[in-house]
A protein has these predicted regions:
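A conserved ligand/cofactor-binding region detector
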Residues: 9-406
Length: 406
């Protein structure tokens, strides 16, 4: 069966020679105030291309955040290499929301260098409290679901548990509301307008996520019937990683977020015909999936977009989990021994039939073999029994958008 992983990650052929590079960075970044100042100066000039005449206060925040990210990445790489060299069961937490708030103070405390950073900033004329106020909240969730997801995530960090969290990155996550006696307005909260220094783009990690189309049958040489999902449209899920630090234990786990990309961002033939808007229509339609979380679902299009958002991040996450499993194992009957998936509320519940689809259609398992795997992998947390929180989708919408799952 063909793999759904688009870009194959290959080790360099001259791996022995590459060891020379890693030998050059064997030492850890300094954690004292002088080391922090040197890192900030480096990033001001080389990461942000600023000089003594153009650097502003916000650039100081960016240089500090990037300097801390350097130190997190050192521990992050150590953590991931430990998991690679000592394969153990991995826990994956799937949630549509994460209320992680501001990361600067948390990372300083978890790295154990809060006072060192305060001293470093005072040496260059700044107060840490002022710099902290320049950071915006990450727009990955602001409701009770996001708070509970983050609380669960925080409980895992001190235990050095090999845990991974996945979700979607939204360009304008939630709407900021302003109201008066006469009107109520909603405007996008574009929290990514000045970038997010903690994220690491993974341009090479792309997965196709399919929508619409139809299901057709085919038979193999042994007379077995296989169902194949064909036609429709595909969207690419691109990964962004955010290091999540444990409290002074040098364990840094990963929050992997997915952003929607069009397979073809620009149609040159349509552009040459003079239809400039249609030339980028596919790009706009694809990226709408990761524009705003919880779009208005009063109409059919809003409901369909919500289901798209949920299936999008679930499918990408499961494809990624399977790829990680196959890097060390080949027998899917042992999948549950190496993988545990926790579903946070109803939003990622489409993961159950999606894992069945991937195991049957992509990995070639028989239906009952796949079911034996699926029932041993998932855990589920439900935080409320309010009717509005228990989502339901019409069979007609599900069959139209995801014909293989209906």
């Amino acid at each position: 069966m063909p793999s759904s992983f688009l870009i194959v990650l290959k080790m360099p052929q001259n791996r022995h020679e590459m060891e020379k590079i890693w030998d050059l960075i064997a030492d850890y970044r300094r954690m004292d105030s002088e080391g922090l100042i040197h890192s900030m100066a480096h990033h001001l000039e080389f990461s942000q291309c600023k000089n003594r005449y153009t650097a502003e206060d916000f650039d100081v925040y960016r240089s500090l955040a990037t300097s801390l990210r350097d130190r997190l990445v050192e521990f992050w790489n150590d953590t991931q290499q430990t998991y690679q060299l000592n394969p153990i069961r991995q826990v994956y937490f799937l949630s549509l929301e994460y209320l992680i708030g501001r990361s600067l103070r948390n990372n300083l405390i978890n790295l154990g260098i809060y006072e060192e950073c305060r001293e470093a900033l005072r040496l260059i004329g700044y107060e840490l409290d002022e710099i902290e106020e320049m950071e915006v909240d990450a727009g990955l969730g602001n409701g009770g679901l996001g708070r509970l997801a983050s609380a669960s995530w925080i409980r895992w960090r001190p235990s050095k548990l090999p845990a991974h969290a996945t979700g979607s990155v939204m360009n304008s996550e939630f709407l900021s509301r302003s109201s008066n006696a006469e009107s109520r307005r909603e405007t996008p909260d574009n929290w990514l307008s000045q970038g997010y220094p903690w994220e690491i783009p993974r341009w090479e990690v792309l997965y196709p996520v399919q929508f619409f189309g139809y299901v057709q049958s085919r038979w193999d040489d042994e007379g077995r019937e296989w169902r194949q999902w064909v036609g429709g449209e595909s969207v690419l899920a691109m990964a962004y990683d955010v290091p999540i630090s444990g409290f002074q234990n040098r364990t840094v786990n990963n929050l992997r977020l997915w952003s929607a990309r069009a397979p073809r961002a620009f149609d040159f033939q349509i552009f040459n015909r003079g239809d400039y808007m249609q030339a980028v229509e596919e790009k706009q339609r694809s990226e709408t999936i990761s524009k705003v979380l919880y779009p208005n679902d009063q109409g059919f299009s809003g409901k369909e977009l919500r289901l798209k958002q949920q299936y999008f991040f679930v499918s990408a996450s499961l494809q990624d989990i399977i790829r990680r499993f196959k890097a060390h194992h080949s027998d899917f009957s042992t999948f549950h021994q190496w993988v545990a998936i926790q579903l946070n509320d109803t939003h990622p519940s489409i993961a159950v039939p999606e894992l069945m689809r991937l195991l049957v259609d992509e990995e070639g398992l028989e239906w009952f073999e796949a079911w034996e795997v699926v029932v041993q992998v998932f855990g589920y947390t439900n935080h409320t029994v309010l009717p509005e929180a228990l989502e339901r989708w019409s069979s007609s919408m599900l069959g139209h958008l995801l014909p293989r799952h209906s």
